[in-house]
Amino acid sequence: MNPFVSVIIYTTIILGTMIVMTSSHWLLTWTGFEMNMLAIIPIMMKSPNPRATEASVKYFMTQATASMLLMLAVIINLLYSGQWTVMKMLNPTASMIMTMALAMKLGLSPFHFWVPEVTQGVPLTAGLILLTWQKLAPLSILYQISPSINPNLILTMSMLSILVGGWGGLNQTQLRKIMAYSSIAHMGWMAAILIYNPTMTILNLTIYLMTTFTMFTMFALNSTTTTLSLSHTWNKTPIITTLMLTILLSMGGLPPLTGFVPKWMIIQEMTKNDSIILPTLMAIMALLNLYFYMRLTYSTTLTMFPSSNNMKMKWQFEASKHKTLLPTMIILSTMLLPLTPMLVVLD
């Protein structure tokens, strides 16, 4: 891709998200979403093959449908309240349609079917943007309208997302699909706490962004997209492969790693609000995610597959790739648990 074109595209993606997050007018918010959607499609189609084209079309159709629903909700709210200001939705129907539109943009269940297919069909860079940056805009709107969201609707979606995110990833060998199902499950956790403590959603999102960014950077560094190719990475980058074990366990939510913080705090917050059954079910369903992370850990770092002598020397001929941010992100993705006492500000 031409560097000049690349700069324009990435600037538009950043600008689109910023417009959504900072605007107080629904029409500007909608414009930001459209800029965001149209700018990422060239990145998704960077390598022109049928899979990338199919993924781009699926993404475009899903996001366009979600944008139409969003505008429908805005118009219903406008007819009811007479204003375009981004605030809590006064009309229950408008609130429900808006929640469904944003759930479709985020990939919450039952609107999750596009996420694994699209992520699998695009390059690792586009997959990373899709599962991290593209979540910011819809979540910022959900955060703003959280007081008027129907609790039953959002909790049903979140429980389904955690279940689907765990179940869907069980039999996968493609790393991008595993990360997509992991994203669905994490979005479920964020949606569950939204009506109780929206600030905690931001904490969860921050940790999710850090761990997902670190994993995708490691995949890109080793040029791996399947569990089989990942099992050979110890020949190329033994240190990074060892660190990958801790990142995977952190994503699974095991103490004493960073990924345990949001799960612990969300379950604690929901229990404080006299919700016992939901957090119990969420904790049980999180074990499904943990299982496929453990399986990935086992095949990647705890076993050594038979390989030829040529393969063992492969690391000597690897071209050096930029890994400036990686050490910092690895530390943040694994060692933030001791900072938890400082998060009392969230209560």
From Swiss-Prot:
It is a multi-pass membrane protein. It is an enzyme of class 7 (translocase). Its EC number is 7.1.1.2. The keyword Magnesium does not apply. It is found in: Mitochondrion inner membrane. GO terms for biological process: mitochondrial electron transport, NADH to ubiquinone; mitochondrial respiratory chain complex I assembly. One of its GO terms (molecular function) is NADH dehydrogenase (ubiquinone) activity. The chain crosses the membrane at residues 1-21, 59-79, 93-115, 149-169, 178-198, 201-221, 239-259, 274-294, 325-345. Its main location: mitochondrion. Belongs to the complex I subunit 2 family. Core subunit of the mitochondrial membrane respiratory chain NADH dehydrogenase (Complex I) which catalyzes electron transfer from NADH through the respiratory chain, using ubiquinone as an electron acceptor. Essential for the catalytic activity and assembly of complex I. This is NADH-ubiquinone oxidoreductase chain 2. It comes from Hippopotamus amphibius. The gene is MT-ND2.
